[in-house]
Amino acid sequence: MAQRNGMSPRPPPLGRGRGAGGPSGVGSSPPSSCVPMGAPSTAGTGASAAATTTPGHGVHRVEPRGPPGAPPSSGNNSNFWHGPERLLLSQIPVERQALTELEYQAMGAVWRAAFLANSTGRAMRKWSQRDAGTLLPLGRPYGFYARVTPRSQMNGVGATDLRQLSPRDAWIVLVATVVHEVDPAADPTLGDKAGHPEGLCAQDGLYLALGAGFRVFVYDLANNTLILAARDADEWFRHGAGEVVRLYRCNRLGVGTPRATLLPQPALRQTLLRAEEATALGRELRRRWAGTTVALQTPGRRLQPMVLLGAWQELAQYEPFASAPHPASLLTAVRRHLNQRLCCGWLALGAVLPARWLGCAAGPATGTAAGTTSPPAASGTETEAAGGDAPCAIAGAVGSAVPVPPQPYGAAGGGAICVPNADAHAVVGADAAAAAAPTVMVGSTAMAGPAASGTVPRAMLVVLLDELGAVFGYCPLDGHVYPLAAELSHFLRAGVLGALALGRESAPAAEAARRLLPELDREQWERPRWDALHLHPRAALWAREPHGQLAFLLRPGRGEAEVLTLATKHPAICANVEDYLQDARRRADAQALGLDLATVVMEAGGQMIHKKTKKPKGKEDESLMKGKHSRYTRPTEPPLTPQASLGRALRRDDEDWKPSRLPGEDSWYDLDETFWVLGSNRKNDVYQRRWKKTVLRCGLEIDRPMPTVPKGCRPQTFTHEGIQLMGGATQEPLDTGLYAPSHVTSAFVPSVYMPPTVPYPDPAARLCRDMRRVTFSNIATHYHYNAQ
């Protein structure tokens, strides 16, 4: 197909070529662009596979029997399972968040038929019936696919209306079942089961749904939860389903599908994944593994260290607790807040640090030399208080052990070893020199590596394990508790991904209260992306129909070559090359659609800033597109929502991030001081407590301790019991609790202490109390006078 200009009035429809995919759907891509270097021309090995050459393409086409579970005549992408696209998409590393241009075009080519049918809900249902059995990749993570399935063949779905979970969408249609590859060697019981053809597992109860504008959802049937995977086709082709935490839960995942946190020490793995003896988990961690650094793997970001805690008070060695006026009181207040939120006993598992501290040697901050102090010994028989200082009893199975992936990982390319020691523990490279080196530990003193001397590592998240086996993360940046995983084995595969994609799970109120789901990010659920320019109302006319939009998205280049050339001349760009690539795509898209990028940015809430004068400029930077160094800085993006801003800060290890404000005066103050006895809490009782507090809160913001103080605010002050004494919302002098009449000087009246006012914990109950005083006659009289 001849190469087309992005400014053509109406590009011709893309030929079906290989149906739902193949290099023919890429439009003007080179013939060999979809075949990776070194990849074989055909993936089929059967003698009956007829190898033919598609006219106009340099791809060696095969005609295999189709994807697993598909009928023999199915077929828009019947060659995907044995085609070059599957080989290309199987090489995406787990640390990478976005797909490359070649992988992007492969995703768009495979999903071409679904995109063209995304006009109405009826058209999507017809497409799912016509292409039933077709296997489509999810991009990220590798090994997950969407098997196109009509709704009538989805077990347990019935007449579920997904618009109740997303009311702003005009229509949402369930079109596929999410399946994933299974390693038969990892689970011999699978074998040739009927439910696992060709090593594919479909027992997770996950379904893929599509909405208007190619909004992609993942529906969790067991939890009745709708997860927003992508807001448009551009985001789906670029990121896939890698941000969906629920995908990483299945314990039948094959080796490296996706790769989990590597715990090569069998003793530590058995300690963390022990289900029947979970009460002794905390004692075992304190006795043997306190201070051990685990290289935590989170999909879509770099490795980061997680230091296993021996006691809750050890958090005083890390920021932001170390710089608090009184760290012990702040930790007590935080522990009290966690007791109120979790409504059961819990265990502080570890502190997650920024990636730059991985491999830095240090000892515990106990006043001695680094690496020479043993962790504090904990008696195996002593009784400890609940709420972070004592192990918790877990009801139910936590999960099976995660198989160790054979491939190495880490910055150096080597594996990792974790050797217990009487002094400290480590995670170091698996080469001979590293194996012979002494073990190290990440602490708060004597830091080595990229950090300056005297600096203290910052705890970005504190991993918690509640009494029911669920894993939560306490974020010291904003003081909230976020769900991370349903069990420990799930956490070792998903890492802290649950805190990086906040506000993307919609569930009924009872389910959200049970799992402590955060509030929905209305910006993501109710508005399109501001940089999805192919959906802009002022875009060119040819980009308003499906064929034109697909040709626009899959056109080659999109300004990335210029950025890569510019990065070779300016090494400073390499640190944030993904941001510059995204800006280059925006500029190229705006030029192809005839839009002014500066106007679009300002309409969305951002502005173009001049590098020298720092004043808004409406002129678009054209020098970057010519390969020259720009005298303008990158266009500032529109202001992010608090949840999106926090997720970006956690993903990029932004240690300077601060919340915008403290909890307001109308926030809900929890007066619950109940002491939860470990091992005596039933699951239904815990869920009932969480639901009751959610009803009492009535959607108000939670009054909570804030370890990270916003700019221009005073630090919060707490008593030894964790009760806040005074707020820090402003720089103005606050009320000290001393009361005196305004017409009498304080010299003649002794000061009288007035305790600070406590907000009423239950606004709904207060309203009911006030309504009891209103009789029917008063209401009738009030209505009569208003009517007059």
UniProtKB/Swiss-Prot annotation:
Compositionally biased tracts (Low complexity): 26-56
Outcome following mutation: R130A: 25% loss of viral replication
Any one cellular-component term (Gene Ontology): virion component
GO biological process: symbiont-mediated suppression of host autophagy; symbiont-mediated suppression of host innate immune response; symbiont-mediated suppression of host PKR/eIFalpha signaling; symbiont-mediated suppression of host type I interferon-mediated signaling pathway
Top-level lineage group: Viruses
Outcome after substituting K126A: 25% loss of viral replication
Compartments where located: Virion; Host cytoplasm; Host nucleus
Single GO MF annotation: protein serine/threonine kinase inhibitor activity
Chain coiled-coil ranges: none
Location of the region described as RNA-binding in the Swiss-Prot/TrEMBL record: 74-248
Gly residues composition-biased segments: 16-25
Listed result of changing R151A: 75% loss of viral replication. Complete loss of dsRNA binding
Keywords, comma-separated and alphabetical: Host cytoplasm, Host nucleus, Host-virus interaction, Inhibition of host autophagy by virus, Inhibition of host innate immune response by virus, Inhibition of host interferon signaling pathway by virus, Inhibition of host PKR by virus, Interferon antiviral system evasion, Viral immunoevasion, Virion
Chain segments carrying region Disordered: 1-82, 366-385, 609-663
Consequence of substituting R231A: 10% loss of viral replication
Interaction with host EIF2AK2/PKR: annotated span: 671-788
Database matches in InterPro entries: US22-like
A family per Pfam: US22
UniProt similarity note: Belongs to the herpesviridae US22 family.
Subunit structure: Interacts with host EIF2AK2/PKR; this interaction retains EIF2AK2 to the host nucleus and prevents its activation. Interaction (via N-terminus) with host BECN1; this interaction inhibits host autophagy. Interacts with the viral DNA polymerase accessory subunit UL44. Interacts with host HSPA5.
Described purpose of this protein according to its UniProt entry: Inhibits the establishment of the antiviral state and the integrated stress response (ISR) in the infected cell. Prevents the phosphorylation of the host eukaryotic translation initiation factor eIF-2alpha/EIF2S1 and thus the shutoff of viral and cellular protein synthesis by directly interacting with EIF2AK2/PKR. Prevents stress granule formation in response to eIF-2alpha/EIF2S1 phosphorylation, thereby rescuing viral replication and protein synthesis. Also inhibits host autophagy by interacting with host Beclin-1/BECN1.
Protein name listed in UniProt: Protein HHLF1
Gene behind this protein: TRS1
